[in-house]
Amino acid sequence: MSKFFKTTLAAFLGTFIALFAVMLLLFSIIGSLSSSISSQESQKVIVAPNSVLKIDFAEMIAEQDAENPLSMISSPGASGKSLGLLKAINSLEIAAQDPSIKFVYMNCDNVNFESLSSLEEFRAALSRFKSSGKAIIAYANNYSAPGYYLASIADKVIMNEYGSANILGLGSNLVFLKDFLDKLGVGIQLIRHGKYKSAGEMYINNNISPANREQNQEMIDAIWDSWVAEIAQSREITVDEFNQLVDNLTLSDAEDMKEHNLVDELMYQNEVEDYICTLTETSKIEDVK
């Protein structure tokens, strides 16, 4: 009888402790949600009339928000933070619907995306913003191929009068580690089927295989063809005309870009700021929200 009561009491205590733990967990979750909602409400931004959404790519746009302190070692001065692609796209969608935001101003000097697919997704989001009837203004001192691909969607593309164009097409750099691993005495046993299964080639080869070269070239060509088609449509030139300019290394400076209708205006940074002030009816750039 004594053993029965002990067993019953132990079961009761165990159940009570479990229920108590569950209740604590529920209260903790409810408290966290309440805190999160309160925090979001307190962080709501009131946008002033005639505001501008400025995009300067100070943080890399990645698939997800992240903070990587090691990036500050490899890239001195970098913040180590990245902005999630979804958050960046949502900001554009909100701006398109907000009557207080007049247009987007985009500085394309340091276009920084984690992947080419993220870059393409963001350009598509800019295109949707443009479809809302609001303008996009793009500026850069110097245009790279990714930077110009993004800028070309803008209603007005501006470039520094003494800027340079580094639009040379696309390429890829592959790393091979066989010699390095051999020196470390590390042997790699790679199991694969088919010559196009090249994910492990970097560990067993010192050079790119013909099959891997073929598939990489196909991928790069497909991406470039897609970019050029979008650029040509935005700038109202033909695909062949743009490819010829790139192939002949015609685009080297701002004058070349202007001559071939790839930029609309040549301005210094302070002139662009004055132009934005005019559009927003403000006296100085510091007053532009």
Residue ranges and their predicted role:
Residues 2-238, 243, 247, 277-289:
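Small-residue-centered hinge/linker elements
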Residues 269-271, 275:
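Amphipathic alpha-helical
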Residues 250-254:
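Internal gly/pro-rich beta-alpha loop/helix module
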Residues 158-159, 263-269:
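Short acidic-hydrophobic, aromatic-tinged amphipathic segments that line or gate anion-handling sites
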